[in-house]
């Protein structure tokens, strides 16, 4: 990415870390505020950042283990308290830190009796253990435990269902993302007779990177996704598209009848919490008791449904309807017969 090619917007945003704390070696928390956004912008950024944090930020995990004299994952070894399955689960939860994209090899070679922890893993210099006290196994007698490990860096979640071979090799479900959770909320305020918004971002990480570093990486990932659109009007890009024969004739003749706009809204509403409706306490608490946490949850109900809820009177229904209409231009159906 070339910084000079990106025009600097007139609107100047500022950010601030409001709260930062370590709740443990494997749980770091950060809360950030970004403002001022024009009305509607904070929601756009909040949805994108949350999805990028949860799905694009990379992490390092153990993806493979090989034991001696083991047939299947539910085997037990004499002198070891845990089953192979339990040990694999413990290995899966080990928090690692590495900047290398190469597949790394590691191992455990321990003589009991003793507790085996993450600190006992023999690692390459490019990999670091975040919490050396994480439990792996308990050796109760004077026997060795030898395990070969494989470490990889990626994003998201890789499901392999703990498949094993006859030689004691196990491919582990890997949770690569270092993000434990990510939320956002939006608050409006008035500035120079204009409505402006503050975006609050909350990030929890596993300790392999700070919440601030996670936000930076998620931002870079989003920039990489969108930067291609900056040059779409340039003649060079058009020629390149023509040379690659990327035109409408190359697409399948079958028309796509899916309402893309509707699908996009449905996805977005699943990420928008009802806090952003800024409802009075009575209406808000009633919705929470109904397990309504997002706008998507709320849209499963009609006005008639809400009126039947205990302590949810006509006034509360009106407040919900007004908030949905004002903030998201959504008309909550009066009853099931008016649902489009």
UniProtKB/Swiss-Prot annotation:
It catalyses: RNA(n) + a ribonucleoside 5'-triphosphate = RNA(n+1) + diphosphate. Pfam families: RNA_pol_A_bac, RNA_pol_A_CTD, RNA_pol_L. It is found in: Plastid, Chloroplast. Its EC number is 2.7.7.6. Residues 264-340 are annotated as: Alpha C-terminal domain (alpha-CTD). One of its GO terms (biological process) is DNA-templated transcription. The keyword Chloroplast applies. Its main location: plastid. SUPFAM superfamilies: C-terminal domain of RNA polymerase alpha subunit, Insert subdomain of RNA polymerase alpha subunit, RBP11-like subunits of RNA polymerase. Keywords: Chloroplast, DNA-directed RNA polymerase, Nucleotidyltransferase, Plastid, Transcription, Transferase. In plastids the minimal PEP RNA polymerase catalytic core is composed of four subunits: alpha, beta, beta', and beta''. When a (nuclear-encoded) sigma factor is associated with the core the holoenzyme is formed, which can initiate transcription. The N-terminal domain is essential for RNAP assembly and basal transcription, whereas the C-terminal domain is involved in interaction with transcriptional regulators and with upstream promoter elements. Belongs to the RNA polymerase alpha chain family. This is DNA-directed RNA polymerase subunit alpha.
């Amino acid at each position: 990415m070339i910084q000079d090619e990106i025009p600097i917007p007139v609107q100047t945003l500022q950010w601030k870390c409001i709260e930062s704390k370590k709740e443990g070696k494997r749980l770091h928390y950060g809360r950030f505020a970004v403002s001022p956004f024009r009305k509607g912008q904070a929601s756009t950024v909040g949805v994108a950042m949350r999805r990028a944090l949860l799905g694009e930020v990379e992490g390092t995990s153990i993806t493979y283990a090989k034991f001696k004299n083991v047939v299947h994952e539910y085997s037990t070894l004499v002198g070891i308290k845990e089953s192979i399955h339990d040990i694999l689960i413990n290995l899966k939860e080990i928090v690692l830190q590495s900047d290398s994209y190469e597949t790394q090899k590691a191992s455990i070679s321990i003589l009991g009796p003793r507790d085996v922890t993450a600190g006992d893993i023999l690692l390459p210099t490019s990999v670091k253990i975040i919490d050396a006290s994480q439990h792996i196994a308990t050796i109760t007698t004077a026997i060795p435990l030898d395990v070969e490990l494989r470490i990889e860096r990626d994003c998201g979640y890789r499901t392999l269902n703990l498949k094993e071979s006859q030689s004691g090799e196990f491919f582990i479900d890997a949770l690569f993302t270092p993000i434990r959770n990510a939320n956002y909320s939006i608050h409006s305020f008035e500035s120079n007779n204009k409505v402006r918004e503050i975006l609050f971002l909350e990030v929890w990480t596993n300790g392999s990177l700070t919440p601030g570093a996670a936000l930076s990486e998620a931002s870079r990932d989003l920039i990489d996704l969108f930067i291609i659109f900056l040059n779409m009007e340039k003649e060079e890009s058009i020629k390149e598209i023509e040379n690659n024969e990327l035109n409408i004739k190359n697409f399948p003749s079958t028309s796509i009848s899916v309402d893309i706009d509707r699908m996009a809204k449905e996805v977005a509403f699943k990420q928008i919490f009802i806090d952003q409706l800024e409802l009075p306490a009575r209406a808000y608490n009633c919705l929470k008791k109904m397990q309504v946490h997002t706008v998507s949850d709320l849209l499963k109900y009609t006005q008639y449904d809400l009126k039947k809820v205990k302590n949810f009177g006509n006034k509360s229904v009106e407040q919900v309807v007004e908030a949905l209409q004002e903030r998201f231009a959504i008309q909550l159906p009066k009853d099931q017969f008016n649902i489009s």
